[in-house]
Amino acid sequence: MTLFNPLNSKKRSQQLKQLLDSEKLVILPGCYDALSAKLIEKAGIKAGFMSGFCVSSTRLGMPDTGLISYTEMQDQVRNICNITSIPILFDGDTGWGNAGNVYRTVRGYADAGAAAIMIEDQKWPKKCGHTKGKDVVELDEAKARIKAAADASKLNGDKDILICSHQEA
């Protein structure tokens, strides 16, 4: 058994893109740690999704309201990527702030091995996606976040992580 999986973010993002480009339904079961992600892989499922709600509820017993830090989430990403070979879409919440924070978050997830990251348009600190009264950023800030994520997704001009935009607006 290999402790660390050598697949990098670019290889994983290519795997996920191939799945998404196919004519087949792509199922992304939710995981929250290395074990749950490994169980998804062992079940023969081709990809997964690390949910911020799942991470927050299993680590803190609390809903996804911004209590989990960027560092804690990046640690989860790294642990999951170290033990699995399937591509996983990771919840990047709001990117923990403005466009600069989004850039850092996307690069950090890519460096940890993520195939894809999902960024929300909520204001920081965020509210759980299942609750009412969520505030979203202004259109200019949303555009800046998306641009920052797209810029961060390219290392040396070569895309190495897919970007998904989660819109609450």
For every predicted segment, state its role.
Residues G48-E72, G92-A99, M118-D140:
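Glycine-rich, proline-tolerant flexible connector loops at the mouths of alpha/beta enzymes
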Residues S36-K42, W96-A110:
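Catalytic cores of alpha/beta
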Residues I27-D33, G48-M50, I88-G92, I117-I119, ...:
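Hydrophobic faces of well-ordered beta-strands that scaffold small-molecule active sites
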